[in-house]
């Protein structure tokens, strides 16, 4: 029973011990790292195929359609068929393109997202590397994808691709600021930049109830979630590849597997940012009986992450796309000030000489108050703008 309660860790220990019986220590360590990397890659690819299927089913349900239902049971293998189709497509390079940057960009888009997965704590004992600067590591590697998409747009020798690349810089860098500020609020509460440490800091509190940050700083979670939508380039922030404006955006000239790399990066990014939201705000692998049976942690983590992903897909089928001026104004005039207010509140409250429970109650009430005030101001501005348009139309 003890073996089953922490199944994956115990299998790893058994395999490591078995190899140590006839191999030198350096080769055992090398095999451990290589095998761990392979398991991570295979796991994320399977997760991406499943997430693509979930998106198609959720959106089709919202649009009163059936969705994929031909390839495999319930259409589960439709994404596999799409990959096989892309493998047969011709790889083309446009005339006048800067070939080195053009061919390097698809790889640079994918690899940073895979590297970030190494610091995500999937359960209590399953993590690639528990860095004490995990949050800083995520922020640093996350910026590489911005440069890669700009490389793709600039090197394609296409005006629509270049315009999409410019939008990458404007949108992703703008929304990265409030997202990082929201994560810093969680870091201040947890007192660590380790992703595993942030999860452990959300464990058993008053009456053994979890201290999930979504219930402590709900406004911080809202800022992070909206910013993450923009970082994923998801509706209503999909201006980087708006079909009606700039055709396919920065990867318009890519075909075959080069295009598939961008497609893969988009879905890995969706899984990754949802996993980060789970880690920082939803308690990560924390859940009932996880201390007695750590193997449950990976299922709790997967369920929470899937819940966030489904909500993202629901938004895709519900909201229209922003205009570029609305998108930029919302980032700098709304999200950045709100993120700074949350960060300031956390910095002040954690220094108060009161119990953690009282601190969290103060933070929750103040977050709700700021959120209601912000909604009131936004509603007033919207009414004023609508009235001006109405009067202008009469004139």
What is each stretch, according to the model?
Residues 1-395:
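Selective transmembrane helix interface/packing segments
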């Amino acid at each position: 029973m003890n073996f089953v309660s922490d199944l994956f860790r115990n299998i790893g220990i058994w395999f490591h011990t078995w190899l140590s019986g006839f191999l030198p220590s350096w080769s055992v360590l090398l095999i451990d790292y290589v095998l761990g990397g392979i398991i991570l890659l295979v796991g994320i690819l399977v997760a991406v195929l499943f997430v693509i299927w979930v998106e198609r089913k959720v959106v089709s349900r919202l649009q009163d359609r059936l969705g994929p239902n031909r390839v495999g049971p319930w259409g589960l293998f439709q994404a596999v068929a799409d990959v096989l189709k892309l493998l047969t497509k011709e790889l083309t390079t446009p005339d006048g393109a800067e070939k080195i940057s053009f061919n390097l960009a698809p790889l640079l888009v994918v690899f940073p997202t895979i590297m970030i997965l190494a610091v995500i704590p999937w359960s209590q004992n399953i993590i690639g590397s528990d860095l004490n600067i995990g949050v800083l590591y995520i922020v640093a590697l996350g910026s590489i994808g911005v440069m890669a998409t700009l490389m793709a747009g600039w090197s394609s020798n296409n005006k629509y691709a270049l315009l999409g690349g410019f939008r990458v810089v404007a949108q992703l860098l703008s929304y990265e600021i409030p997202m990082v500020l929201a994560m810093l609020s969680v870091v201040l509460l947890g007192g660590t930049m380790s992703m595993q440490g942030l999860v452990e800091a959300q464990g058993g509190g008053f009456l053994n109830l979890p201290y999930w940050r979504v219930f402590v700083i709900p406004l911080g979670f809202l800022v992070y979630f909206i910013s993450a939508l923009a970082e994923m380039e998801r509706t209503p922030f999909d201006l980087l590849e708006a079909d009606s404006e700039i055709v396919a955006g920065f990867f318009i000239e890519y075909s075959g597997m080069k295009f598939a790399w961008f497609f893969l990066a988009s879905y890995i990014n969706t899984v990754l940012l949802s996993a980060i939201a789970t880690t920082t705000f939803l308690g990560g692998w924390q859940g009932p009986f996880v201390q007695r049976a750590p193997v449950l942690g990976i299922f709790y983590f997967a369920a929470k992450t899937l819940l966030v992903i489904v909500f993202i897909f629901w938004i895709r089928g519900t909201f229209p796309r922003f205009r570029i001026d609305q998108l930029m104004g919302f980032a700098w005039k709304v999200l950045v000030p709100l993120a700074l207010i949350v960060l300031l509140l956390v910095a002040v409250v954690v220094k108060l000489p009161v119990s953690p429970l009282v601190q969290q109650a103060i933070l929750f009430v103040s977050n709700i108050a700021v959120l209601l005030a912000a909604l009131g101001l936004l509603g007033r501005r919207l009414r004023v703008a609508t009235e001006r348009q109405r009067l202008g139309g009469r004139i």
